[in-house]
Amino acid sequence: MLIVKRTSEVKGIINAPPSKSYTHRAVISASLANGLSILKNPLNGADCLSSAHACRMLGAEITNEVEKWTIIGSKLKVPDNIIDIGNSGTTLRIITGISSQIPDGYAVITGDDSIRKRPMQPLLDALKQLGIESFSTRNNGIAPIIVKAGKITSNSVKIRGDMSSQFITSLMMTLPFSETDSEIILTTPLKSEPYLNITIDVLDKFGVKIEKIVEENKTGYKIKGKQSYRPCEYTIEGDYSSASYLIATGVLLNSDIEVKNVFKNSKQGDREIIEIVKKMGADVEINENNVKIKGPYNLKGIEIDVTNIPDLVPTIAVLGCFAEGKTVVYNGEHVRLKECDRLNACAVELSKMGADIEEKPDGLIITGTHKLTGSKLKTHDDHRLVMAFTIAGMLADGETVIEGEESVKISFPDFVDKMKSIGCNIEVI
């Protein structure tokens, strides 16, 4: 667990960790490309290593080093054992689709307790539309999942756009194997679109083209058939989701910090954290590849639509605790479908510290109190809650004890060390 105490000042230069979203998609794309690919600056986090493990099970040769991964991709093979993807929902969803293209037999995909609670039925239903047989072993729409090898026999699939963009990413990465051109048709308005923009961006670098469909009565994506993934050398950019904790720390504390490896023109939706803190009153400096912050700033509450930025909700919740007036988070129903119900967890745990938070069906209303008190907090082994609650603890009176700190290895393995390097008063016990 983490012991967090009030921190008076933070100062220094800190690199944002590599992007989890980009690393997942790049290692899987490289594994599907026939030949040698090099991934520079990959995220050596547990979730991305789960994707690398799954790709090995499906035939890729992967060497993981700290600063680069070497991948020799080849044709998919039948896995010789169950594919255990640990705690990685992204891996589960993408590999479920991809594994349908093994030459014969079956693939079985499962993970830890948390993964075996994550919804999969919308993806299984979509694969069925394409002629692919896949099912939950317990007939309850969650892992373990069994996928049968099979050709794609339909050129159109309909799926909701408001549950998980990972389902759509899985289809995007699988449909290039089809013999014919295909369409993904969205039956509801799309949420988390920036994650699909990341998918399209990565696939483009590996030679796979996807077009967006925007018509009066149809929204979705068009994927040409018989496409081949091509090997390449690819550099992973920094992760704005993880950088949000560094940025919020600088905004709320007496600070002089520079966050490097975050790009002004990134396709990541979570780059919105810059605009959010600016609208709240923080005069941060954004450059081509870094953000400079000299806090603290006097913040004011604002209304924030989190349709496309679900991973920022825990960070926003903490910022709202120290803003004047009300901070309203809305359009966040899908935030309940992450590693845990993050809306409920933020409301319950921050309230223990004295925060004034009202939970709504699609979001939160946070009334700034400017004062929190240390408490013992549960995180449901959710990495984003651990990091957000750490910020709250540094601004609270007394001592804050945060359970489940091991989960940060998923997206920000050296979170504690980097935070301590700029002066944060935190310890692992």
Swiss-Prot record:
Q: Does the keyword Amino-acid biosynthesis apply?
A: yes
The protein's location, in the record's own words, is: Cytoplasm
Q: Which residues form the active site?
A: 311 (proton acceptor)
Q: Which residues bind phosphoenolpyruvate?
A: 20, 89, 118, 166, 342, 384
The residues the entry assigns to the signal sequence are none
**PROSITE patterns recorded:** EPSP_SYNTHASE_1 (PS00104), EPSP_SYNTHASE_2 (PS00885)
Q: Which UniProt keywords apply?
A: Amino-acid biosynthesis, Aromatic amino acid biosynthesis, Cytoplasm, Transferase
Q: Which residues bind 3-phosphoshikimate?
A: 20-21, 25, 164-166, 192, 311, 338
Which pathway, metabolic or otherwise, does it act in? Metabolic intermediate biosynthesis; chorismate biosynthesis
Q: Which reaction is catalysed here?
A: 3-phosphoshikimate + phosphoenolpyruvate = 5-O-(1-carboxyvinyl)-3-phosphoshikimate + phosphate
Q: Subunit structure, per the record?
A: Monomer.
Tell me which PANTHER family the record gives: AROM/DEHYDROQUINATE SYNTHASE, PENTAFUNCTIONAL AROM POLYPEPTIDE
Cross-referenced NCBIfam families, in alphabetical order?
A: aroA
Protein name according to UniProt: 3-phosphoshikimate 1-carboxyvinyltransferase
Q: Which organism is it from?
A: Methanococcus vannielii (strain ATCC 35089 / DSM 1224 / JCM 13029 / OCM 148 / SB)
Query: Lineage from the top down?
Result: Archaea, Methanobacteriati, Methanobacteriota, Methanomada group, Methanococci
Q: Which gene encodes it?
A: aroA
